[in-house]
Amino acid sequence: MARPAVAEPGLLRALATLDHRDETARELMDDPAADLVAMDRTYHRFGPVNRIVSRPAAVYEEWVRPRLATTHAARMLDVGAGGGDLPREILRHAERDGLRLEIVAIDPDERAVRYASRHASPRFHARVATTADLVAEGETFDVVWSNHVLHHLTPAELGALLADTERLVAPGGIGVHGDIERGRAAYLGFWAATLPFAWNALAGSFIRPDGLTSIRRSHTASELAAAIPSGWRVKRGFPSRLELVWGNEIADD
């Protein structure tokens, strides 16, 4: 299994450094030479973890469902979709409600798209692409969404993503980029919640080490608020969630 580029600090040391974002920390899955078996195992086991951490049911109810109908299919874009467990979960909610939804999942990592494409369907399509590619193609979507992408980005990349999102959102649509909020409660909570599974359900995957690294790389609400252009807003949610929202129906905090 691949080793981290920077060793994961001990718990007390990590908690002591969370006042500042660690932009030098690197996730194991971002290594082009990462073990492919461990990658697949990670994608396979993301589902149960993401249902708790990323709350796709709440995303569906607040942002997606209001834009769906029975008469025509709405379009949703998932940016940096990874293995595609979250968009497929959202699609299941729409199908349960008898509402029409088509999802395009994009990721620049061929390994992620290869895994996500195993679950392709008429309403779920994964492709290797960036938001800039879709802007160039003239694509638009009713919902443009990402999960746990923001903490991977440099300031310039964040600005480009938000600018592309504004171009990709169709009239009346919404752009939502969700991520973790960095903090001691988030770090300690994930550390403790995943510890009992480190040697069984999560063994051989990158979920636990990369999850902890993600928190160290993530922003606080005030950091994101200072980094976003006019028209975007930061919303806080549970558990330790942040959402950057753009569109005509931004709810008040």
Segments predicted by a language model, with ranges:
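C-terminal alpha-helical "lid/dimerization" subdomain adjacent to the S-adenosyl-L-methionine
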Residues: 178-227
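A short glycine-rich, Lys/Arg-flanked "PGG" loop and its adjoining helix->strand segment in the class I
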Residues: 159-171
